[in-house]
């Protein structure tokens, strides 16, 4: 037994001894190599590693193909969902579950997205948002522009939570606030809706920060919405929030075409 061990040591430790000549040769080659050439090789390797890392990030991003349509009940998101997929008008009703379908975007790359229409009912919307948010490439928050004045507090409450959740994701989604029902005479403009939402969200974050903290020290503090000590603006967020106007129903009612061209362009841009 002892003689066998002695032979193993003499041979260079088995498998290690087999590769030792190659390692010695490599070491000698590196020592004899021109330092300039060695620097070039190291630089090329660094570039290759960077490209591999970038490709991994891109593939992770490309695997997120979901676009979440969220909003209050009767905001018109389900009709938007139908219009994007079929171009046709259809009577819709409040749903208690999600609907999803593949959407081919209108660009020269032939990309596709998965549209997911989430329920707008107060008791369900956060539950479904939690289920799908990690797969979101983009979030389209649909607002009823005609009913906005009376719903502004409810809209801001839900939007506050959606923004906080989006900021906490590893891959921050693209974010759009679609001001729907612009065909109605009393509809508010996207600019006015943005201004009023900024005021409401500013009030909300003040009241939320003043609320007593939990006794559970293990719980993490919620993300800060905007810059502390300044009036809230969407431009302060780490994600870009865009606004546009649209009309899922269209100016001619049930028989007319929808005014969603800007929304289609936005989806093509983020696909």
Swiss-Prot record:
Membrane topology: Single-pass membrane protein
Alphabetical UniProt keywords: Endoplasmic reticulum, GTP-binding, Membrane, Nucleotide-binding, Phosphoprotein, Receptor, Transmembrane, Transmembrane helix
Chain segments annotated as transmembrane: 37-57
Keyword Glycoprotein carried by entry: no
Positions of post-translational Phosphothreonine modification: 214
Top-level taxon in the UniProt lineage: Eukaryota
CDD domains named in the record: SR_beta
Any GO CC annotation of this UniProt entry: endoplasmic reticulum membrane
UniProt GO MF annotations: GTP binding
Residues the record lists as Phosphoserine modifications: 112
Binding site for GTP: 71-79, 92-95, 120, 248
Any Gene Ontology biological process: protein targeting to ER
Stored Pfam families: SRPRB
Subcellular location: Endoplasmic reticulum membrane
Recorded family membership: Belongs to the SRP receptor beta subunit family.
Subunit structure: Heterodimer with SRPRA.
Role according to the record: Component of the signal recognition particle (SRP) complex receptor (SR). Ensures, in conjunction with the SRP complex, the correct targeting of the nascent secretory proteins to the endoplasmic reticulum membrane system. May mediate the membrane association of SR.
Protein name: Signal recognition particle receptor subunit beta
Lineage, highest ranks first: Eukaryota, Metazoa, Chordata, Craniata, Vertebrata
